[in-house]
């Protein structure tokens, strides 16, 4: 996993307001200008009206130009949110700890979800709160033993050999999870295209990825 600390520092440029804005957006929900004004007032120990529009929007524009955030308008309110590609790198930079979701694929061996769950139950460093697995629609009814924190998404069998479709399906789910959870990805199971898609997503979003061996050992992939 690539260290983007230097790149982040070049964008922040030591400007405290940018740090505050990014940390506030890491809370996982889009923020209105009034939310950011309040966060900046708290950080600088000022009154709300002591935070100027220029301070907020100049720094928002700098972060948006750098590709870290994007803003949009809903009715009369303008919102800002982090771009998904920067959520985990910014968590790493600010040392923000988020609950973990482990994502993987269930191939011909339907026990993978049980193996991973038991493996991480004994892991001191990573304790996933949730598990999300993708699998073929033909596995419906063949997988059992689910716990409440395990979710399975079924993909039509004919899509599993279409790389772009698999990538799109998985990507849509990852984007929904990222604002609130750190995602770690097991890339060793499923079709070739599924493994490729999971690996690409781990690189795109700066996520930790690993391989579960046949003897249930976890090998972390260091990019």
Predicted features, each with a name:
Residues 185:
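Conformationally flexible catalytic loops at phosphate/diphosphate-handling active centers
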Residues 1-182, 193-223:
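Long, low-complexity, Lys/Arg-enriched
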């Amino acid at each position: 996993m690539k260290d983007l600390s230097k790149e982040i520092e070049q964008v922040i440029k030591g400007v405290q307001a940018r740090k505050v804005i990014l940390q506030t957006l890491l809370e996982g929900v889009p923020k209105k200008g009034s939310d950011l004004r309040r966060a900046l007032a708290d950080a600088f120990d000022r009154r709300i009206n002591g935070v100027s529009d220029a301070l907020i929007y100049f720094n928002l524009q700098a972060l948006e130009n750098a590709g870290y955030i994007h803003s949009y308008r809903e009715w009369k309110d303008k919102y800002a949110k982090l771009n998904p590609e920067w959520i985990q790198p910014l968590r790493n930079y600010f040392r923000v700890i988020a609950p973990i979701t482990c994502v993987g694929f269930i191939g011909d061996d339907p026990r993978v979800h049980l193996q991973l769950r038991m493996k991480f139950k004994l892991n001191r460093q990573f304790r996933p709160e949730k598990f999300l697995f993708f699998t073929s629609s033909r596995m419906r009814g063949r997988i059992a033993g689910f716990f409440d924190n395990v979710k399975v998404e079924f993909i039509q069998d004919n899509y599993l050999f279409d790389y772009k479709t698999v990538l799109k399906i998985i990507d849509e789910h990852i984007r929904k999870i990222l604002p609130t959870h750190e995602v770690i990805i097991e890339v060793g199971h499923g079709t070739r295209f599924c493994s490729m898609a999971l690996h690409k997503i781990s690189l795109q979003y700066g996520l930790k990825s690993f391989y579960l061996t046949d003897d249930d050992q976890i090998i972390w992939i260091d990019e």
